A protein has these predicted regions:
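AMP-binding/adenylate-forming catalytic core of the ANL superfamily
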Residues: 105, 399, 405, 427-519
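Conserved structural elements of the adenylate-forming
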Residues: 36-41, 191-213, 221
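Conserved pre-ATP/AMP-binding loop-to-beta segment of ANL
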Residues: 17, 151-180, 187, 211-217
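Conserved AMP-binding/adenylation subdomain of ANL enzymes
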Residues: 199-217, 227-311, 320
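Gly/Ser/Thr-rich phosphate-binding loop
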Residues: 266-269, 279-367, 470
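Conserved AMP-binding A3 loop
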Residues: 31-33, 176-202
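Conserved ATP-binding/catalytic segment of the ANL
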Residues: 375, 382, 389-390, 394-448
Length: 547
């Protein structure tokens, strides 16, 4: 690997020094040069705090320009950033900080108010993302240094310029970051990603999304604490000399449309739910009007109508749209049929945290219905059938994008890798031309409204601890989480409670359950079952039978 991630970043900062780089919603944009200045200030701070290459630095806050600069400061210093989803409950944040051996924690006000620093005894410095001021430091000298940081910087760099910007020269197999797929004890896995994986993802995006040019804007909607948002909505555009516009939180349709109009993005990265909502609210009501519905059945006329709808839809996205890349979940079949009929520029990719994240992709004009593209550059894939003679099987991959393993979890690492191949846990099939189709996800992952990973087993673990619950199964129904519950009728009978009363009692505990869950993973409805779930010989629930 002659090229590296930090080299790509350094070249982009150098070429685009006076161009826009980072912008928070409603704020003045920062140039690449201004961002570089803040990054170098943070390098000085890390040095004063005694941070060495490969030391861990946790980040937990809403998406923002400062979050981005904190991450870039860590990775270009040679430290290992540990991004944490700010929607996680306090206990999960404590678990990740402790398990990752983080020495520094950068956070925002909301996270600071939610957590307890006493639960993270190994932390040496805690800093605000809002203004990069210290909240806590084991050593007084760090707080003093922070108060004089601007003065120290000005003295060290009286005429700060690109020649003063020095980035860590990484090795391909060196740890770049640790990304936790969850925060709960017992479920937590820290995915250890090397620099080669980040570089390979960014390089693929640069080579295959050629219409994005320096000075183009990208809107960040997905969580930066997840690899999809981090690699494709932040690192990739910054390596291209683009600017990133941070919405900061799940936006209202009004804010989103305003951002599209202002930024006029050529590329939008999203989860399918966002596009599906726009189609259902903006397009379907129009097409379902009696007259248009009639005209849609007339050959030729329907094409004219769909062409007009396509133009209106692209205008709603800012007017310059070249492509929307969807990932993280399957696109609704009916919506996909409509998008294909109107030749709308969408595509569906496939990836996972363990591949930082890309595994498969194809541009919109090549993608096939229900497919998620072809295996990306520098990666190989094979299907391992669960049963002899079947085309569908588990997808195994290897190549530049794959992780090193799970942090401090050799057992999980060993169970995922075999002879250099990594098991994705997803059931897939290839067609004769190499397009990949996902038939089912062994990992049962559910995608939240803004791209958050929802692990149903974790929610079920909490539900099963509620009074009179025998077993449960969490399913996704059109974006709403529903818990299928089998009450413990025997226990209820022993306590003199009849069947209907125990169902009501369990239902009354839904609010208490949701208080234990992040907002995006809360249960909309309990649905009671009179019979237990069908099981495998190992007594695992046959999840695919229940929707």
């Amino acid at each position: 690997m002659s090229e590296s991630l930090n080299q790509l970043l350094h070249e982009s900062f150098s070429k685009n020094w006076n161009h826009k780089a980072l912008c928070d919603l409603g704020k003045t944009p920062l140039t690449y040069g201004e961002a570089a200045q803040q990054i170098v200030k943070l390098h000085l701070l890390l040095q004063e705090a005694g941070i060495k290459p490969q030391d861990k630095i946790a980040l937990c806050g809403k998406n923002s320009a400062n979050w981005s600069m904190a991450f870039l400061a860590a990775i270009t210093y040679g430290a290992v950033p540990v991004p944490i989803l700010n929607d996680f409950k306090a206990e999960s944040i404590h678990n990740i900080v402790n398990h990752s051996d983080a020495r520094i924690l950068w956070l925002d006000d909301a996270v600071l108010n939610a957590i307890s620093l006493n639960e993270m005894p190994t932390l040496e410095v805690v800093m605000q993302l809002g203004d990069f001021t210290p909240v806590y430091s084991k050593e007084e000298k760090v707080i003093k240094f922070c108060s004089e940081l601007d003065k120290t910087f000005a003295e060290k760099y009286p005429n700060f310029g690109i020649n003063d910007l020095v980035f860590h020269k990484e090795q391909p197999e060196e740890i770049a970051l640790i990304n936790y797929t969850s925060g709960s004890t017992g479920f937590s896995k820290g995915v250890v990603l090397p620099y080669r994986a980040l570089w390979s993802n960014v390089r693929f995006a640069i080579d295959n999304i050629t219409y994005l040019k320096a000075d183009d804007g990208m809107i960040n909607m997905l969580p930066l604490a997840h690899m999809y948002g981090l690699a494709i909505e932040m690192l990739f555009p910054l390596c291209k000399g683009c600017y990133v516009y941070f919405l900061g939180k799940t936006p209202s349709p009004k804010i989103l449309m305003g951002a599209f109009a202002q930024v006029q993005p050529k590329l939008i990265i999203a989860v399918p739910l966002i596009l599906e909502k726009i189609i259902r609210s903006k397009v379907l009501p129009t097409l379902q009007k009696p007259l248009l519905n009639f005209l849609m059945h007339i050959p030729g006329v329907s094409n004219l109508i769909l062409s007009k709808v396509r133009k209106q839809l692209i205008a709603a996205f800012g007017g310059q749209l070249e492509m929307i890349v969807l990932g993280g979940a399957a696109l609704n079949g009916d919506i996909e049929d409509l998008l294909r009929r109107m030749k709308f520029p969408y595509t569906v990719g496939y990836g996972m945290t363990e591949c930082a994240p890309l595994i498969a992709y194809a541009p919109w004009y090549e993608i096939r219905k229900a497919s998620c593209g072809k295996i990306v550059d520098r990666m190989e894939a094979r299907i391992v059938p669960l049963h002899d003679g079947e085309d569908v099987g588990e997808l195994w991959v290897k190549g530049s994008n794959t992780m090193l393993g799970y942090y401090k979890n050799q057992e999980a690492t060993d169970s995922t890798f075999k002879d250099g191949w990594m098991n994705t846990g997803d059931l897939c099939i290839f067609d004769k031309d190499g397009f990949l189709y996902i038939k089912g996800r062994n990992k049962n992952l559910i995608l939240g409204p803004s791209g958050q990973n929802i692990y149903p087993e974790e929610i079920e673990d909490k539900i099963n601890n509620l009074p009179y619950v025998a077993e449960s199964l969490v399913v996704d129904r059109e974006g709403m989480l529903v818990a299928l519950i089998v009450p413990d009728f025997d226990k209820a009978k022993q306590d003199g409670i009849d069947a209907e009363a125990v169902k009501e009692l369990i239902n009354n505990n839904r609010a208490a359950l949701n208080k234990m869950l992040a907002s995006y993973s809360q249960i909309t409805r309990f649905e009671m079952r009179d019979e237990e779930f069908e099981k495998t010989p190992k007594r695992s629930i046959r999840r695919f039978l229940y929707k």
